[in-house]
Design a protein with these regions (language model features):
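Catalytic loop of the DD-peptidase/beta-lactamase superfamily, centered on the K-T-G motif
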Residues: 2-145
Length: 145
């Protein structure tokens, strides 16, 4: 964890494990990569195409996301589907989600149009993950030009 520009050790609060998960996932990078592969459509026996379509259908417009630091110059539209943020990164759709618990941050996402995805796990509550993610998508977008 970073507090006042100094790295500090933090421990996961024991209360995180006293109730069933509600908006949280415990996963390794291997787990996240398998989930990403399935969501990209490469495991239809796990996530059938019709389910993927339902999960990634825009449900709620999320204008606040258009103001996200490091993202705002690229985001043209933002919605929430079922469990996924659905961004229009310039003209490239991105299916994306982030997570944050004490001491940890995570980002996962993919672009159906570009056929690429990524997952990042960091053991810090640092906002650097936003810069890493937006820079990744900027590189993907620019490589398609």
């Amino acid at each position: 964890h970073i507090r006042k520009n100094v790295w500090r050790t933090v421990h996961v609060a024991p209360d995180y494990y006293k109730v069933a998960p509600a908006a949280g996932v415990n996963a390794s990078i291997t787990d996240m990569s398998k989930w990403l592969i399935a969501n990209m459509g490469y495991k239809p026996e796990v996530l059938p195409p019709q389910l993927l379509d339902e999960l990634t259908t825009p449900r709620i417009k999320t204008k606040k996301d258009l103001r996200r630091r490091h993202w705002k110059e690229h985001l043209k539209d933002a919605h929430y589907g079922y469990g996924w943020r659905l961004y229009q990164f310039n003209d490239m759709p991105i299916v994306y989600h982030s997570g944050w618990v004490e001491g940890y941050r995570a980002d996962i996402g993919y672009s159906p149009k570009a056929g690429v995805g990524f997952a990042i796990l960091i053991n810090a509550e640092s906002n650097v993950i936003n810069k890493l993610s937006s820079s990744f998508w900027e590189s993907v977008y620019e490589s398609r030009l």
